[in-house]
């Protein structure tokens, strides 16, 4: 039994050592950078926000999602009233967001959306103020529908504010 354990440990050490050598032999940064492909734009209308101050985790703000529209290559439709963006802010200028809502395509297909992200007010390396707002929406579409591809990809998004639209505009890209 002791011999068997020793052999397993020796084999594990050799395998780990080999993989370490392989990792160290790679060049950094990697030669390949993931590509992004535009997927859709969401124009989200919002209701009046309310906050729960001083929770054990920070300040919780809830922003109702009241509707809107979306459009991209091969998909178009409306944002369903009834979702919300749940934000949790700390005292260091960082906010975690989690928006949960549904969209409905023009051909009647409902798709669930869960969008998690970070809003941060900080400073760059030179000390200048910087604003960071990125999120990663996940889609849950009927698997056998023409929108099933939304289930099998990673997405990133960032906001765009315009004076013409009083909500938030989110531009969404698929990571190829």
Where would I find each of the regions flagged by the language model?
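Beta-strand-enriched cores of mature, soluble protein domains
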Residues: 26-176
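Bacterial N-terminal signal peptides
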Residues: 9-19
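Bacterial N-terminal signal peptides that target proteins for export
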Residues: 1-9
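Sec/Tat signal peptide C-region and signal peptidase I cleavage site
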Residues: 20-25
